[in-house]
Structure formats: structure tokens, C-alpha cells
Amino acid sequence: MDKIVIYQILTRLFANTTGVNVPNGTLAQNGCAKFSYFTPRMLAEIKKLGTTHVWYTGILEHATQTDYTRYGIDNDHAGIVKGKAGSPYAVRDYYDVDPDLADNPANRMQEFEKLVARTHKAGLKMIIDFVPNHVARQYHSDVKPETDFGRHDRTDWHFSPQNNFYYYPHTPLAPQFDVQGYCECPAKATGNDCFSPAPSHNDWYETVKLNYGVDYTGDHAGHFDPLPDTWIKMRDILLFWAAKNVDGFRCDMAEMVPVEFWQWVIGEVKRLFPQVIFIAEVYNPAQYRSYIHTGGFDYLYDKVGLYDTLRSVTCYGTSAHQITQAWQQVSDIQGNMLNFLENHDEQRIASDFFAGQADKGRPAMLVAACMNTNPVMIYFGQEVGERGMDAEGFSGRDGRTTIFDYWSVDSINRLYNKQLDKSRLSDDEQNLLQFYRTLLTLCHTERALSNGRFFDLMYANGHLQRQYAFVRADGHEVLLCLANFSDEQACVSVFVPRHAFDYLQLSGGGACVARDLLVNTQETIRFAPDESVVTTVAPWNCKILKISL
């Protein structure tokens, strides 16, 4: 099976060169990317990175401060919308797409369907968000109104298994901040499990929690027989998008929805669309196996684990031996873990809040991409060192690329402009782009990376604190991977125990010529049981030495 490489894109920001970047600017001022920007040439360029799947973030229609009433879409109250553009995770119609992304909003679904077709024709698969835990406070589907959430709820009950929301009967919403006159009565529970009619500014106040039959005020008891109405609605939504040839769903905050629902709904979807993949955003390692073995997820975020460890090694001087402990915690489910260093929730590697320099992400990226056969993901702009240090508006200067505002991201525009002219990229950006292209392409072309076994060398190399070493092998293809998390060039001596040869079923060994696949250079080393490989690795860099035995 080919290794999955996911390229996440915040769709509204992709190659948007139409605006002037006014903080808190409107659509008219700052512009917005369109489905049509993803031309066959543009998609071919994305695939050239080694991409197999594109996660188009922010496809579903969500709350916004932009007026689309002329297209039959009700306005959202500005007091409960984060940013002028709005959060992609405050969905207001599960059956529709964001009109911002269409050249002609009246034809927005047809334009989306054409994007699906172009993506597939480019040899790529499409992933979109499924946001099951919460919806925008003013959710209303103008496409499927007969299935609207809350339409048949008993609003005089705090909880009923057949209600879609949780209510505070006869109690108005009273946030702890100014919502500019927005009224909601009875108040609904807020999306981040805030069971109070008075959410704070730090809560997900723009959303309401969906009810899957769990009585949160009654010892969290589950009432799943008969099937809760929300389950049925959500199954129908997933089937709607699967029928449009979407290849996978990244499921937002999956742990906030009962695993019993996932077990049922994933089975329902895969019965009709067995090829569709489900990726869970999860942060509780104690629940990982339940969401795989019971829930049926194909892949889970490896955030609390590998991501946190790699960030700590990169930024805080943590020993590289901690990487071993991180993968050992999920060794039995390693193939189900999605590795990454950036996404829309996390701070950019090059930001002042992370490493401060994009090149310092190289060794961590080697580990994330090459440690095993499981999927890896990068976030658009990561490959040229986007810093995420703009103050776009609602988001502020926080090291992240905004998901709330209309904006134009300079590095991405210089990378993915309509002419595909990369002459405006700096030498450092060009070099980093080449690194990512080479690394991610190797994940497909080298069988040892796409299908081979993994052997961690750190237990036999206690002296390595700022370097991490492992072997990948498939038959006679052997790769020695080295990551240097140091400001200094490392002259490393890596001991290769006989156990590695036995486990990887290698024979022979001795002096050989090894080729560094990342830069296409050769060096002579000794690779033999119970001997040491001596080589040098540049500061904040890495090597993949291909060894012929």
C-alpha cells in the first residue's frame, strides 16, 4: 500500500492575491480564494510535493459576517461569529458549501463538484472536514430544511435522547461578554461541553453542542436504544458527501462524540463506500485504541505523543531518546497514527512561538515522515517556511495562519501564484521546498519507507542526546536515517547491534558506499552487526543513507 501523504489547505487563503490585507478586513477588501484556483496545473504542482490526499479545510458552509442573503442564505448575527470570515468549524449548513469559495455563489455546489473531479483527475484524493460535535448557534440548512437540527426538539426539556441539542428551559443565553444584542431562548449548551447558559469569551461561544444521547447531567449515561435522532442525521450527512465522491473525512474533536456512534456510523458509511477513510482529531491517549478498535477509525492524530515530543526536542532541549518513548506508547497501533508538525490548530514551525526558523523543522520532519508506514501530513506553506506571524484580525499574531479572517498569505502566494512562478521565493525557501519534495517523494519511491520494517537504534546509543537514529528496511533495501537536533554539526558514531540485522532479516555487512537520498551524495561507511557507522550531519539537518548489502 502506498504511503498516505496529506496536504492540508485552508481553502479560503490559498493563492488569494485579490486583497490588500486590512486587519479585520471584509471579503471586498481582502478577497478570498476560489474553488477554481485549483486548476489542473495547480493540482499537479501540489502532487509534485509527494501528496496523495488534499484536505480542503473549510469547505462546508459556516457562520460568517459576509452578506449572502441575495443567494437565499440568512445573515449570521455578528456577535456570535469569530472574525469577518468566520470559523470553518461553526457549520451552519452541513449540506452546503461555503459561498465565499465560489466564483458564482449561486452555483457553489456545482463548482465544488468540479473541484472533486479535477482533484481525482490529478491523481489525488479529497478529504473534507466532518464537524460532528457542534454547529453554529444559528444553524439553518436552506438545502435540506426538513432535516434541520432542533426542528422537532422538546425545548422544555434539558435532555432527551431524541433532541438534537441540550437546553436550559425558559432561560435566555447570557454570555459573560457583549454579543451585540444576540438573543437565544432557551439557551443551548455551548460546543466545548460548556453546560451553562453563560459561556465566557474563552468558550466556543459561537457554537452549540450536539446531543448524541449522552446525559451529561445524569452521570454521563448513554441512551442509544432506540438510535438517537442526531445519529440518523449525521449518517445521512456523511452519505451525502460520500456520494459526491469525497474520499475521506477528518473528524473534528472526535473524542467529544461517543465511540458507540462512531462504531455505528463508520460501519454504515463503509458498507456503501468501503474506500472512504476516517481520520479522528483526538488528544486523549487512553481512548486511542477504543476509537480504532471499537469506533472503527482508520487514523488518529498523533499530537499528544509524537508531535509534542518532537516539538519538545526541537525547542526545549529534551533528549532525542524521548522519541523512542513516544512511539513505544502507540507501537501496537502505529500504523493508525497520523504524524504531523503543523496544522491549522498548531503554531507554525518558523513562528516565534515554535522554533523561530523553518530549517529547524527538518530533523523532526524526517522522523515524522520516515519512522513508519503510517500517514504523514503537512500544512500549506510549511514547505517554504510560512511563519504565521501576521496579525490578521480576530486571530491576532499568535504563530498560526488565521482560520477566522479574510487574508492573503505572502509566502503561499509566492509559492502557488496562478502563474506557478517561484522566482519570488528566496534561496532559503527554494531549498526548503526541495527538501520537502525530496523527503515526501522518497516516502513513495523507497520501498523501505513505504512498506519496510522499522528498527530504533537509540537503546544501543545512549550517548546520542541531540541526534535520533533508526533503520528502515525491506528485503535488501536498507536505509539508515539520522536526525540532528543541534546547532552544531554532529560527527556521530551510531552503533548497529546484531539484533537489528536479525530483526530486519539482513545478511552480510561491512564496508560499503552509502548514498544520502536527500542530497544525492555518496560516502563510504561500515555497516555491519555490532559495529558503528561514523558520519557527519549538518546542524538542524538529517540524512537518509541508502545502503547496499
Region locations from a protein language model:
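C-terminal beta-strand-rich structural cap/linker in extracellular carbohydrate-active enzymes
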Residues: V5, I525-L549
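Solvent-exposed beta-strand/loop surfaces of large extracellular or lumenal domains
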Residues: G248, G510-S532
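Short, polar loop/linker segments at the starts of domains and inter-domain junctions
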Residues: T17-S36, F353-Q357, E523-V534
